[in-house]
Amino acid sequence: MSDEQRHRPNVEREYRNGEIVVHWEPRYCIHTGNCLRALPEVFDRDARPWVKVDGATADKIAEAVMLCPTGALHYERLDGGPQEAQPEQTTITERPNGPLYVRGNVRITGPDGTVIREATRVALCRCGHSENKPFCDLSHRKVGFRTAAPASDGQ
């Protein structure tokens, strides 16, 4: 999928059965592969459709979706099972040579105050080169972005 296709606002794919709906928003996906490794019988990037919601239980699918650090994957339970939980506190994790992963009650607003995104998981650009700012689009790899080693406190 080209960058132009990936970053179209409002493009979303939906994969459903009677128990769960998996939503995928390609503009936020940075292909960490967490879903593929967690549940290959459901998530297979070489298959079409690439999400097969009949490949595992709704509980297993929900667990795998929650491993997506960008929130590109999210789910809705139709079977009365638990919906995505709101994290109790917001955390920000630096990825070496990569984005900031934010988990929590995230609300991103533009300079004019309009809400760009409300989510529980996002990956924010740190390199300054994303064409999907403020979100990471993997441009850090193209430009060779490197983070500095943490300063030693002498201990």
List where the protein language model places each region.
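Short cysteine-rich clusters marking metal-coordination/redox-active sites
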Residues: 29, 68, 125-127, 136
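Ferredoxin-like iron-sulfur electron-transfer modules
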Residues: 9-30, 43-63, 78-83, 113-124
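A short, structured beta-strand/loop element
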Residues: 33-45, 101-114
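Iron-sulfur (Fe-S) cluster-binding modules
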Residues: 1-19, 150-155
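Iron-sulfur cluster-binding cysteine motifs and their immediate structural context
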Residues: 34-47, 65-79, 133-142
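Polybasic, low-complexity binding patches
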Residues: 77-91, 147-153
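Short histidine
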Residues: 131-155
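Short Fe-S-cluster ligation motifs
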Residues: 2-4, 53-78, 90-107
